[in-house]
Amino acid sequence: MSIQITTELVKELRNATGISVMQCRKALEEAEGDMQKAVAILKKTSSDIALKKADRNAADGAVSVKNAGEKTVLVALHCETDFVSRNEDFLKLLSDLTDKALNEGIDKMKEDSKEMIDGVIQKTGEKVELGEVFEVTGPVVGNYVHQGKSAVIVSLEGGNTELAKDIAMHVAAMRPEYITSSDVNDEIKQTMNEIFAKEVANIDKPEDIKEKMLEGKMATYFKEKTLMDQPFIKNSDQTIAQLLDQNKAKITSVKRYSI
């Protein structure tokens, strides 16, 4: 005798899993009305769907940063389209993964992430995969997340959290490639010197003038690329180095991630 799959039973399974009504009904029919078996069937289906989508390109996504005490974690979650990156289930998954990484540790989060991700793959129909995950610890840490697509975490020695947040926002906006001029290696300097030397080579000026022009181009280029030399985005009359000196602070780390 066949088991009648009631609307209430389907609704109960849907509320428990978030999976579509059609898939819930199908799972309940296959499980002959057994709720636990139906949940297991849906999990197996989620895993199978994820496997089929494994070779797709998940180039979009979102990033989340959360902190508690002296610990800050960043988690990036990738999907195929911007549409899904704004999906409620996708964003809840990202939030849950970030909470788990913060409260239980990154390794534990990664262990538990597959089943959580597979469920969202089944709901959205897109490939979803875990991206960059890292942790920053320290007494003074600030972060800035821009439109859920990029994030910066800045750790300071001295200063305060608001200062760290301001510098994180600056880094997100200005995208410096180096923290200090000493971070620029000789190979990069040589490459840029050759590029700018070609630009001034045919200028009708004396050699000493061209040499000064070359030096000026080099100085301007690396000033724009170096965090400490950049004018602070909130006060262009002050460089980041001057801002830090004013607050008796030093940068100990800058981490940035963009989808």
Predicted regions and their residues:
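N-terminal assembly/interaction segments in proteins that build large macromolecular machines
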Residues: 2-259
